[in-house]
Amino acid sequence: MPIWYLAGILLALCTGIRIGELCALQWESVSTNDKAIRIAKALQRLHDTSVSQGARTRIVIGPPKSDTSVRTIPMTEYATGLCRRMKPQSSAAYVLTGTEAFMEPRTLQYRLEKYTQACGLEGVHFHTLRHTFATRAVEVGFEVKSLSEILGHTSVTITLDRYVHASLELKRDNMQKLKVVGL
């Protein structure tokens, strides 16, 4: 497995970053000293209505999904260490390639599907990493407002309704907390 793809997959799992944000992420936006990633751009494939034949889409790097998607994501020690080991000389290099050429989201999605299928996992998409990050963050006790900001959501309702999946174990743990109040 190429190290850049693996690093991108692990970074997404550690931060909840969107695929388009990761594909547009350059090393100049990663600070291992501050242990943070600054999200200010996203890469997306758009339909090009001006083309009648041939390639009907084009790649655009622009602002992320919403105003709240422009954010700083703190990194774990693991993610920071990974970035320190990976960082190339050029700060203009993209995180996923180590060069000044970006990787398309569908290429990264294709690679992830191949790797997970080789591990016997079916139906894993890149967005699954974001869901997993959010669910695990809640399980370890993240405050939902902070998690919502890390994910770049416009409201905590989006975070709770779409990304947080309560497990039976978490429900049991929460029920046991009632012992504290004598119930």
Walk through the language-model features, giving the residues of each:
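C-terminal catalytic core of tyrosine-transesterase DNA break-rejoin enzymes
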Residues: L10, C14-E21, T107, K114-A118, ...
